[in-house]
A protein has these predicted regions:
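Electrostatic cytochrome c docking/interface patches
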Residues: 16-36
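Bacterial N-terminal signal peptides
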Residues: 7-16
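The canonical Cys-X-X-Cys-His
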Residues: 31, 38-46, 68, 105, ...
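Positively charged n-region of N-terminal signal peptides that target proteins for export
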Residues: 1-6
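Axial heme c-ligation environment in periplasmic c-type cytochrome domains
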Residues: 51-60, 75-104, 112
Length: 112
């Protein structure tokens, strides 16, 4: 029963992810502020600033906005799906970001 519930929850998350706009126009500047406020540089780097172990340079060219969003809100599922071995693993606390902040963060990362 727990497995069925988990599968349904994952399906629901992907339904929500695909139903949202891929990138909220004009939110990239706010997304840059969200990136800083959430202290993403503890694990990630952009243009050499931050933790260089997991650089995000070019992430917007490598991943769609929906994939970026999925990495933020369902990192464990994305790690499994992509067989990622990056350490430390992405924490799952960002799924609780307010929708406007999440949209802005995705918009910012999509510009990289």
């Amino acid at each position: 029963m727990r497995i069925v519930f988990r599968v349904l929850m994952i399906a629901a998350v992907f339904a929500v992810v695909s139903a949202r706009p891929a990138v909220a126009q004009g939110d990239a500047e706010k997304g840059k502020a969200v990136y800083a406020a959430q202290k993403c540089t503890g694990c990630h780097a952009i243009a050499g600033a931050g933790n260089k172990n997991i650089p995000l340079d070019g992430v917007g060219k490598k991943l769609s906005a929906a994939e970026i969003r999925a990495w933020i809100i369902t990192p464990k599922e994305m790690e499994t799906k992509t067989k990622s071995t990056k350490k430390p693993p992405m924490p799952d606390r960002y799924s609780k970001l307010p929708a406007a902040d999440l949209d802005a963060l995705v918009a910012y990362l999509a510009t990289l």
